[in-house]
Regions:
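N-terminal intrinsically disordered/low-complexity leader segments
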Residues: 1-18, 195-196
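Solvent-exposed, amphipathic alpha-helical segments
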Residues: 26-34, 80-84, 114, 163-167
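Amphipathic alpha-helical segments within well-ordered protein domains
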Residues: 82, 99, 115-116, 140-144
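Amphipathic C-terminal alpha-helical segment
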Residues: 113, 117, 160-177, 190-196
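Hydrophobic alpha-helical connector segments
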Residues: 68, 79-112, 160
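Amphipathic alpha-helical packing segments from all-alpha helical-bundle domains
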Residues: 78, 107-112, 122-147, 151-158
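Hydrophobic/aromatic residues within well-ordered alpha-helical segments
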Residues: 62, 69, 73, 77, ...
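Helix-turn-helix
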Residues: 22, 26, 30-64, 68
Length: 196
């Protein structure tokens, strides 16, 4: 006589959990793709394949999410600026890194989304203005450190920044095959000594 074999219970799959940053990043992705009207708890949860209940582990409500999204974007921008200083020893390396960074589309998309949101939200407008000012000031410092006088440094910083923002907010971005060559030529143009 054989005894029936007991079937081992299949382990339950672990519940999917995502951290607060995943919610904020997805909110910015949705803001970019569909506008503020679609930045809703249900929409984000569906995109993340989570329940709405998981949202409340991280946020009180949608307003808390929107405030947190702006602050998260701002902090990421400030962290990027700080990271440049630690990853490059010379100002020319930092300038080159900023030019190269322009090509990173996800961050560009988040920047576009935040700029659009800033048109209707005071907190976002303050964050964008602060980040713009810090970016231009930082670039000015790099051009000063590269040997340019204050006016030249300021003009070059603004030219680079306007190029960077303009490239991803207009339909005039270069073809992928042209990007590397254009980035190199822009770098050489910006770090070339003035010809006065």
């Amino acid at each position: 006589m054989t005894l029936p074999t007991s079937r081992a219970a299949k382990p339950r799959p672990a519940k999917k959990t995502l951290d607060r940053d995943a919610w904020l990043k997805k909110a910015l992705d949705i803001l970019f793709a569909h506008g503020i009207s679609q930045v809703k708890i249900e929409v984000i949860a569906r995109k993340l394949k989570l329940t709405k209940g998981s949202f409340y582990w991280h946020f009180r409500n949608r307003d808390d999410l929107l405030r947190s999204m702006v602050e998260w974007w701002r902090e990421n921008q400030l962290r990027f600026i700080s990271g440049l200083t630690h990853s490059h020893a010379d100002p020319q390396g930092i300038i080159r890194a900023v030019i190269t960074f322009t090509q990173h589309t996800e961050d560009s998309n988040h920047d576009i989304a935040m700029r659009e949101f800033a048109r209707f939200n005071k907190q976002a407008a303050r964050a964008v203005a602060e980040v713009d000012q810090l970016r231009v000031s930082y670039l000015s410092e790099m051009f000063l450190a590269a040997g340019f006088d204050p006016l030249e440094a300021s003009l070059r910083a603004r030219a680079l920044y306007f190029y960077q923002v303009g490239e991803y907010t207009t339909s005039l971005a270069p073809e992928p095959s042209e990007r590397e060559e254009m980035a190199e030529k822009l770098y050489r143009l910006l770090v070339r000594a003035p010809t006065s």
